[in-house]
Amino acid sequence: MPRIFRITALFLILCTLLSACGGSPSESTAPAETPAAASSEAETHLQTEEGWSVVTVHGVEMLWDGSRVKDQYADLDIDAMHFSDFGEDLFTETYPVETERYVLCPGEITEAEVLHIRGAEEGPVIYIVAGVHGDEIAAWYAGRLLRGATLKKGELYVIAPANTNGAKNVTRYVKDRQDLNRSFPGSETGNEAERMANAIFRDIERVKPYLVFDLHEAIVYTSGRDFLGSSLIFTELGDAKDMFFDLLFATQDGELCANEYVSYGPGPQGSINNTVSNELGIPAITVETFRGFEIGRRVSDQLQIVQYVLRYLDMR
């Protein structure tokens, strides 16, 4: 799509979102989690359950309780799987790389390994934090697969899952409702989530990447386009602005992902997105796939988005 039409399309999208929110261009925020009414007249092929209605999101029927859709959970042996299990065009090229591993918060319930992948040539550095919420499984499944990525240039840091205890127990929280993604920049002397947030934040500060990817999933459904699933969130983009909107438009043009994505911002206070952008001046993109879709579709979307950026930056 020519850039002038893309800019026009972006303007129309922003106008639509702003009219729904009643805001001005400087007041772009994530969507309110307000339930929407599901149509009882729509033809459905799903068997309903007590307390659940049927909604259709991007052509897919799913069950909805008035606030959240029913999670399409799947326990995959992800470390035995390959990129090709989620798409024939994913990470097909192979390049020689060097790798090293190190651990954050050693000996704690939050202990997590960071894998550092280095291509043969110098280039951009990307830091991927996948699964700060442990029950957002497609996010950290994608992160586990990305540990097998190779690069022709540049460097990749991958921590997946970032919330190891939450992933182990399939819960959003680290423990006792401690939300890792509301704990940044964290504290060396705080609770478990705050200590882990601090370790991740300090590692990003040390590495100084060009971009941070924050891989997530959403389960709350509101109405139409105004819900968090299938979205890209940013706070400050800096030099990554053109790349971000080219990525967004690629989903809307049908070039990328199973359905179009929309954008929101800024990231919430205490989130990795908001904190690294405002305190370190490093652009961060939060990817939110939608948990009402089947797991393969969600993992594939996460991988396609990361691959798009790596190719955009000529790292692959």
Features from the language model and the residues they span:
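C-terminal motif of bacterial Sec signal peptides marking the signal peptidase cleavage site
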Residues: T16-A20
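Bacterial lipoprotein signal-peptidase II cleavage site
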Residues: C21-A30
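Alpha-helical transmembrane segments
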Residues: F11-C15
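Bacterial N-terminal signal peptides that target proteins for export
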Residues: M1-T8
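Structured catalytic-domain cores with a bias toward divalent-metal coordination
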Residues: A36-R316
